[in-house]
Amino acid sequence: MADKYILAIDEGTTSTRTIIFDHAGNKMADAQREFPQYFPKPGWVEHNANEIWNAVLSTIANAFIESGIKPNQISGIGITNQRETTVIWDKKTGLPIYNAVVWQSRQTAEIAEQLVKDGYGDMIHQKTGLVTDAYFSATKIRWILDHVDGAQARAERGELLFGTIDTWLMWKLTDGDVHVTDYSNASRTMLYNIHKLEWDKEILALLNIPASMLPEVKPNSTIYGKTKDYHFYGSEVPISGMAGDQQAALFGQLAFEPGMVKNTYGTGAFTVMNTGEKPQLSDNNLLTTIGYGINGKVYYALEGSIFVAGSAIQWLRDGMKLFKKASESEAAAVASQNDNEVYVVPAFTGLGAPYWDPNARGSVFGITRGTTREDFIKATLQSLAYQSRDVIDTMKKDSGIDIPSIRVDGGASNNDYLMQFQSDILGIEIDRASDLETTALGAAFLAGLAVGFWKDLEDLKKEYKPGKVFKPKMSTDEREDLYTGWQEAVAATRQFKHRPRQSK
């Protein structure tokens, strides 16, 4: 395997990356390219699917140029992606009929709210494991079909295809030969029955979405198809692994046993627990989702999605201009001299799990004349840890499983202050991955298993490289006192409902 490699495409919310891994899981190349974000109206977030495709092609080329590795040295390709983001395109031309509607976008909130008002929320939860929310793909499909002239009729004639970003990239790489998704991405559409492992006819009928639009659903580690040689520099390479970003990170963290938990601190923060081979429906607003399907078995997960994590640090940098580099936030937090009396609730786009309150807005509590820039930065960092505790406590309640430690990754987990505070406020060990790119590594592992690059899960476990471990230093009394303050801050935030009149 010395001259063979696995290539992973990691298509995120703000940028695309291509990473090439060797057999030991080492990065041999890492190419990244950002692409534009579109905000047509307040609360709307869209992407141009062709710009994403061009970014993918660009990063593949740059990864080969940077490393000197040849396309014919790639044994398999893994794809991981921002989940829920919805693309609808013309089957013949391959052209999207509208921008991709991004997972963060709230433009379909009215559709989701109407489903709940009409009493369908519980049925949808029982079948899909999800709460009824604009976050997921189903309402986005309905919205596009409603807002593009003639789209519903074209869909009913079988002229249109739907896909999340994994499906779109697979279709493009194979030049339209393969229209598939995987268990993990399908389970985030709000259209997939996670018990029967099939698209749910009742929900499709409810939303008037033609089944002909939908991709075939396959396991996460299998050969789906091959690249067209003209898209991959003369080589036809198997595309053999696929998973939504958070499930890929779970796999990349080698969390193969029930009860193992990972937390990824990206734009949002996503806590995922492997719950084994039976779906465990949450009574407390967590999402039940498919972790991955491999070797003829399907493994389920509980997930808590926090909408604002790393983006809160970006807000401090770009919106508030409190520092120039995100890395400066750590030194500021350490320099803060206050007693943690300031709380920032970063509900910029509502609150995610376990509250699912789309109407909440960001707030700050506990400031005095003596509050400093450093105090404000520290409180914002702490909000990431408090939100994660909200989810972890709920996860314990739902699963009945004690959580002795958490494996963490993602950009904000680089912040030692945040990771120590996370350990303190949870009272458990935090294990930070040595390589924070576990999402791409998970996609690579899935792809490599399908083509024999790695033999089995035991073979993968040999590649685990522990990073830094953070252990709690805070007393139980202090921990619970601080967390009580956070709970009060969230409750007060949710009470504030006033919105100024829109100027015409």
From Swiss-Prot:
Please give one Gene Ontology molecular function term for this protein.
ATP binding
Which function does this protein serve? Answer: Key enzyme in the regulation of glycerol uptake and metabolism. Catalyzes the phosphorylation of glycerol to yield sn-glycerol 3-phosphate.
Post-translational modification remark: The phosphoenolpyruvate-dependent sugar phosphotransferase system (PTS), including enzyme I, and histidine-containing protein (HPr) are required for the phosphorylation, which leads to the activation of the enzyme.
Positions that bind sn-glycerol 3-phosphate:
T13, R83, E84, Y135, D245
State any GO CC term. cytosol
What pathway is this protein a component of?
Polyol metabolism; glycerol degradation via glycerol kinase pathway; sn-glycerol 3-phosphate from glycerol: step 1/1
Gene name tied to this protein? glpK
Domain of life assignment: Bacteria
* UniProt protein name: Glycerol kinase
Give the EC number(s) listed in the UniProt record: 2.7.1.30
Q: Residues where Phosphohistidine occurs?
A: H231
For the ligand (glycerol), the binding residues are R83, E84, Y135, D245, Q246
**Quick one: which residues bind ADP?**
T13, R17, T267, G310, G411, N415
**Matching PROSITE patterns, A to Z?**
FGGY_KINASES_1, FGGY_KINASES_2
HAMAP family assigned to the protein according to its UniProt record, in alphabetical order: Glycerol_kin (MF_00186)
Reaction catalyzed: glycerol + ATP = sn-glycerol 3-phosphate + ADP + H(+)
User: What is the originating organism of this protein?
Assistant: Pediococcus pentosaceus (strain ATCC 25745 / CCUG 21536 / LMG 10740 / 183-1w)
Q: What regulates the activity here?
A: Activated by phosphorylation and inhibited by fructose 1,6-bisphosphate (FBP).
Give one GO biological process term: glycerol-3-phosphate metabolic process
Write out the residues that bind ATP.
Answer: T13, T14, S15, T267, G310, Q314, G411
On assembly, the entry states: Homotetramer and homodimer (in equilibrium).
Q: What family does the Swiss-Prot or TrEMBL record give for this protein?
A: Belongs to the FGGY kinase family.
Keywords for this entry? Answer: ATP-binding, Glycerol metabolism, Kinase, Nucleotide-binding, Phosphoprotein, Transferase
